[in-house]
Structure formats: C-alpha cells, structure tokens
Design a protein with these regions (language model features):
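A residue-level signal for beta-strand positions that form part of recognition/binding surfaces
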Residues: 36-38, 96, 157, 331, ...
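Short amphipathic alpha-helical segments
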Residues: 55-58, 140, 432-436
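N-terminal, Lys/Arg-enriched amphipathic/low-complexity engagement segments
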Residues: 35-91
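Short coil/turn segments at secondary-structure boundaries
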Residues: 74-75, 143-147, 161, 452-459
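Hydrophobic residues within beta-strands of alpha/beta enzymes
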Residues: 200, 261, 289, 311-313
Length: 496
C-alpha cells in the first residue's frame, strides 16, 4: 500500500488504547515486567468441526519491521497526549520478545492457544491489534476455503473474489489464505506474482457486449488466446451462448484449446445439464463447464445433490468476505505476569459467562494421535512444564463435563506451538506455500470424517490436563475471594 509518508510503517497499525496502556506502564515503571499473552478464539467459525490456521507469514514480516518511524513519532507528538521522554522510548523501541505459534495449515480448535507471546508487558501489548487482525481474517478465509474444498471433492476450485474483497490487502492475503485452505488457483494476478499461486481467468460479459454478439466476441477472443473458456450467459445460454461457443471451437479447431464454457447466472443445475448435453452432442465431451455467481459450500452441496453437470467452481464473494460469518472473534489474553519479586504468577479473566473465562498460565497444546492409524484422539492443553509425550498413557476429560473422559494408550503427543521468534530473533524458517498446503492436507487426512462434516460435525475433543484444570479452578476461587475482601473494605471506606 502506498503512503504519503516515505517512512510509513505498520507499527501504528494498532488501537490507540495500546499506546495509551504502554504510556501507563512506562510512567508507573512496569513496562519492562515480563508477561505472557495467548491468542485464541472461543467458537469455531461457520459451525465447522475445525479451523485452518493462517497468517503466520504476515505476522513474521510485521514483527521484523516493527519500528516507530520518524513520522510515526511526529504524529503521536501531534496528538498532544504523550511526553517527550515517552516518545523517546518509543523511538528506540525494538521487539525483543519470543513468539510461539501454530504453523500455517495446522488444524486448530476453540479455546486453545494459537499464538503465544512472551516479552515485556509493553511490547506484548503493542502487537495485540495487528496480530489479531491478521489471524482473525486469514484463518477465517482458509477455513471457509477448506469447507468449499470438502464438498467439491476433486473438482477444481478457483478463487474469484478480488473485486468483492474489503480492499487491496484483504484481496491479496485473502487469496493466499484461500489457497492454503483448498483453492487450486486464483484470478488475482498480483497474488500469483507475490505468492506463486496459479492464476486462472476467462472473460467478462463486457467482452461480449463490446462486440454486441456472442459469435463475434468468442471469435475475437479465440484469435488472441489459445486457451479458451467462453462466458455463455450474456444473452441466452442455450440459444446463443453455447451454440456460438461450439461454432467457434469447430472453426478454430486445433488452433485453440477449447477448455469449456462458463455459466454465471440462471438455474445452475438445470442449465448445466442442458449445456452438457449440447457440448456432448457436438463432440466436445472433454470440454468443462465452469460455474460462478455467489457460490459457496452450501450451494455446491445442493447442486451436486441435484445432479448438476458442473466441473469447475469459481468462488468469489462468499469466500473472500467469509459472507456467512465475517468475523472469527480471536482474543488475546494475559495469562502470566512478573510480580514485584520477579516471579512469574498466573493471571486470568473471569466472567459470569463461562465461555469468557480464560485459562491461566503458560501452556502448550499437544495433538494426541493414535500410533495404530495416525488418527487424532484430541488436543490436550497442558502447563508448559508438563510432558505428555513422555507418558505411557494419558487421561483426557472434557473441561466442563468432566464425566466425559477416556484413557489413551499407544499414542504420540505432538506440540502445536512452535518457536517462531526467540528474544527478538527469527528462529523459524518460513515454508513455501505449496508445503503449507500439503501439510494442511495431511492434517485433514488425520482427522476423523465425523469432524469434517459440513453440517453438524461431531465436536473435536479439546481437553485440559488435570494440573491445568486444577490450577484454573484454584485461580478462580482465589480471585473471587480477593475481590470479595476488597469489596468489603471499599464498602467500609465509602461508609465513612
């Protein structure tokens, strides 16, 4: 994105209250206290059985360039809220913390840490907004694309959403996330250049309208392109569009590669059957039928149930905007902080809403898989010093309905949170996009089919270790007692 500032940075891509909190921490001398934050979401998107984690590469690029520029400082100075000494601190700011994260393409689930940030209180606070912005959007789009891939089977899926995305960055990074999730190619040329994603495209209705005739338009296109997919619904699909596509394909013969036709309107199930019939009768049995027009996984599922003869799916608006759930709701919570004695103490947020009660302490997520077939038994959230990978058997129980439990034997425990930055240094080698996509496919394969259902999937187990569970209950009791005592004292003081 171009800027009027030559030294523009993403450092101010944050909420004002992050800067305000940094100022408070700085003025009260706690800004260098060690802290640990964890990012997670509370509910799986689209009522899906899993989510696909995406956005790590952009987080890495963001952290690598995290500096307040001269114009950043000048702008903050102009707000009139911040003393020069604090601005001098910001001017010399560098991220020296550590980040652990799920890798891109990883299957992730509700209420488990996706990203863990450990560093000074100030630096952990500063990056919250951008981190959530990135993870919320890209994970959402990757998951939506995975749902589309799940119902489309082996059919090619093309990402066509650029013009409907919420601006340039959303289109570019949304395309990348969609490719991770399951799309085979994109219409976005810049995304193809930036990420090496295969590009694909046909032509618009404007081409046909410009020549005022299907035949003339298709002929002109065939004269300038070898690979041809003709858009046949500008005027009349069955009377003009397809017949003229067939006519041009026959006239040009081997001079072009007649890939097929695209339908962008009408009853897709009915029309695709009629179009297939016309193409087959003309001898073009290998020509494909492409479909677009506000498609998503639900539409594709219904069209397949109706026997639609569609071979290639072009998915636009409803994918790139996550149309039916445009927000993931990932949050970023403080789980541990250094006390006045230099000791890390656990902290948590409690609420009358059970789903908003956070889990205290630095944690690791372990993926538990059966050695017999590699299938996932569930995820196991444990405190950082616990090592379930060294146990012969593992007791797993539901964190709310504790009577739902099982003992797992002959298993492998794999840590989900991997080191990305260590004391400000990048220690993770970013994989190629094709490697991320292949990794995602492997993880999907390890998931039971019951968790992959588009409608009403079985709930994947995300369990707490006994130690984590006990510590959470103890922390809740301790905080409530502390609040009670302070409330009593406050009431006495107010009564004076």
């Amino acid at each position: 994105m171009n800027s009027i500032y030559k030294d523009d940075s993403l450092t101010l891509h944050t909420d004002l209250y992050q800067i305000n909190m940094m100022k408070t921490y700085w003025e009260t001398g706690v800004y260098e206290k060690k802290a640990i934050f964890e990012a997670y979401f509370r509910k799986l998107p689209f009522e899906n059985g899993y989510a696909i984690f995406a956005g790590l590469e952009r987080i890495v690029r963001y952290i690598e360039q995290l500096r307040f520029s001269k114009t950043d400082i000048d702008y903050l100075r102009g707000l009139g809220h911040y003393p020069e000494e604090f601005l001098a601190y910001l001017e010399n700011f560098e991220f020296k913390g550590s980040i652990r994260s799920a890798v891109e393409g990883e299957l992730v689930f509700a209420n488990e840490p996706l990203v863990q940030v450990e560093g000074t209180l100030a630096e952990c606070q500063l990056i919250e907004t951008a981190l959530l912005n990135i993870v919320n959007f890209q994970t959402l789009i990757a998951t939506k694309a995975s749902r589309v891939r799940m119902v489309s089977g082996d059919d090619p899926v093309l990402e066509f959403g650029t013009r409907r995305a919420q601006e340039l960055d959303a289109a570019i990074w949304g395309t990348r996330a969609a490719y991770i999730g399951g799309c085979d190619a994109t219409s976005n040329v810049r995304a193809g250049k930036m990420f090496g994603i295969p590009v694909s495209g046909t032509h618009a209705h404007a081409l046909v309208q410009a020549y005022r005739d299907d035949y003339e338009a298709f002929k002109a296109y065939a004269e300038s392109h070898r690979d041809c997919v003709f858009l046949v619904d500008t005027y009349d699909i069955l009377k003009s569009g397809v017949p003229n596509a067939i006519r041009v394909a026959k006239e040009f013969g081997d001079k072009i590669n007649f890939l097929g036709v695209r339908i962008d309107s009408g009853d897709m199930a009915y029309m695709s059957k009629k179009v297939r019939q016309q193409l087959d009768e003309a001898g073009f049995t290998k020509a494909k039928i492409y479909a677009s027009s506000d498609l998503d996984e639900k539409t594709i599922l219904n069209l397949k149930m109706q026997g639609a003869k569609i071979d290639v799916w072009g998915i636009g608006t409803r994918l790139i905007t996550a149309y039916d759930q445009p927000a993931l709701g990932c949050v970023y919570k403080l789980v541990s902080i250094e006390d006045e004695n230099g000791v890390m103490v656990d902290t948590m947020k409690i609420s009358n809403n059970a789903e908003k009660v956070s889990t205290p302490g630095k944690k690791q997520v372990w993926r538990i898989t059966r050695n017999s077939d590699g299938k996932s038994e569930g995820d196991y959230i444990a405190l950082w010093d616990e090592r379930p990978d060294q146990l012969d058997e593992l007791f797993m129980f539901h964190p709310v309905y504790t009577y739902i439990n099982k003992t797992v034997k002959d298993f492998t425990a794999r840590p989900i949170l991997q080191p990305i930055f260590n004391n400000g240094k990048l220690v993770y080698e970013l994989p190629k996009l094709q490697e991320i996509k292949a990794y995602k496919d492997e993880q999907i394969e390890a998931l039971w089919d019951e968790y992959k259902r588009i409608l009403n999937p079985e709930q994947y187990p995300v369990d707490l270790s006994q130690k984590t569970y006990d510590q959470k209950l103890a922390s809740i009791a301790e905080i409530r007692e502390e609040v009670r005592l302070k409330a009593e004292q406050l009431a006495k003081e107010n009564a004076k």
